[in-house]
UniProtKB/Swiss-Prot annotation:
Protein's organism: Homo sapiens (Human)
Region spans: Disordered: 187-217
Keywords for the protein's UniProt record, in alphabetical order: Membrane, Transmembrane, Transmembrane helix
Protein name (database record): Transmembrane protein 253
Transmembrane segments: 33-53, 62-82, 96-116, 138-158
Gene that this sequence comes from: TMEM253
Length: 217
């Protein structure tokens, strides 16, 4: 019994791995590549922007470079996504989900904090240095927000990996519509013999009336 249970568990694991390989290498290969490239590119862009903002604000104190966190997380997430596309494994799916969730939460917090710092900062001056710093801050916030949106799309893509997920309601509605159409066709088939029998009865009644009229009283 234990050997049979172990064989069944191994077969289920092999089947899940085959489905994952088909999903990652064929069905969603392009989506995974776009996600990985987007995450890596956004992370590579955010890191120098965060360092520049930190240096211009507080003499290169890295404690003020909040976007460095989402940048590093984006690098790890993009690497895991590429690895999942190259060699699909079940643990890589879990790692990709964990990293994207962490990147989403951290990126959202950083965007909110940075926007509040920009909005509540000192009054803008006419100096070109302050204008350049503002452009760098807004750029870092925009790229960090882009990383958050990419993580949201990645989590949505992972949630659709199982058949029927996020589409059960539409499929159920389609099945109901098909059922209604079949029910609409059945009464038509049933009414056909009824109409025919009704017409036959009318013709028989007319013949009887004609015979009654022709017979002498």
């Amino acid at each position: 019994m234990e050997d049979r249970a172990g064989e069944q568990e191994q077969e289920r694991h092999s089947l899940r791995l085959e489905k994952l390989q088909h999903w990652a290498r064929h069905r969603q290969s392009g989506h995974l590549l776009v996600l990985a490239v987007s995450q890596l590119w956004l992370a590579v862009v955010v890191v120098p922007l965060a360092v520049s903002v930190a240096c211009l604000n507080s003499d290169c104190h890295m404690a003020t470079a909040l976007p460095l966190g989402p940048g590093a997380s984006g690098l790890l997430t993009g690497t895991v996504t590429l690895e999942l596309r190259r060699a699909p494994r079940l643990w890589k799916v879990r790692a990709m989900m964990i990293f994207n969730t962490f990147n989403l939460i951290l990126g959202f917090i950083v965007v909110v904090v940075e926007v509040m710092k920009t909005a509540l900062g000192p009054a803008p001056t006419a100096s070109s240095q302050h204008a350049g710093l503002l452009v760098l801050e807004l750029s870092a916030e925009a790229f960090t927000l882009g990383g958050v949106l990419v993580s949201v799309h990645a989590l949505f893509l992972l949630s659709q990996r199982k058949p029927g997920c996020c589409r059960s309601q539409s499929l159920h509605y389609q099945e109901l519509q098909e059922g209604f159409s079949e029910l609409e066709e059945v009464p038509g088939l049933e009414n056909g013999p009824t109409v025919a029998s009704t017409g036959a009865n009318e013709r028989v009644g007319q013949r009887e009336q004609t015979r009654a009229a022709l017979l002498p009283p």
